[in-house]
Amino acid sequence: MFSMVTEFMNYGQQTVRAARYIGQGFMITLSHANRLPVTIQYPYEKLITSERFRGRIHFEFDKCIACEVCVRVCPIDLPVVDWKLEMDIRKKRLLNYSIDFGICIFCGNCVEYCPTNCLSMTEEYELSTYDRHELNYNQIALGRLPMAVIDDYTTRTILNLPEIKNA
């Protein structure tokens, strides 16, 4: 008889302990219910990047001296620099510059070590395409100015908003 009483007491203690654990889990769930969502509705709302964000590389053709420092500091030897030596002025003349963003790891070494600051990181992060060969950007595509995150053509088109005028 005494064993039945102790088993009944143990059952009661286990029931109280289980109810306490369920209550703790429920309180954690309720505390998360009052928080703001972390995600954004991507095509309609754009992510505002931080100041040190490393996006697409912007290239200024006129500043480049074809020194190939960017190729030497790149961990994967990615930038392709084609140049020709001008014998009359004894300087290199840049013919072609390209970066394949399908392979680029966006480490920023090329931007950091460029002696003429012809390379810079932009806030542009939408580089997705259906064909991986479209990710190979030449100097014309690299020289294109980045589109502002706030004034995006696709968002304006989807939401039928007027174009933002720069003052």
Swiss-Prot record:
Naturally occurring in which organism (per UniProt): Panax ginseng
Binding annotation for [4Fe-4S] cluster 2: 74, 104, 107, 110
Subcellular location: Plastid, Chloroplast thylakoid membrane
Name of this chain's protein: NAD(P)H-quinone oxidoreductase subunit I, chloroplastic
PROSITE patterns assigned to the protein according to its UniProt record, in alphabetical order: 4FE4S_FER_1, 4FE4S_FER_2
Residues annotated as binding [4Fe-4S] cluster 1: 64, 67, 70, 114
Cofactor or coenzyme needed: [4Fe-4S] cluster
GO term, biological process aspect, one: photosynthesis, light reaction
Recorded GO MF terms: 4 iron, 4 sulfur cluster binding; iron ion binding; NADH dehydrogenase (ubiquinone) activity; quinone binding
GO cellular component, one term: chloroplast thylakoid membrane
SUPFAM superfamilies: 4Fe-4S ferredoxins
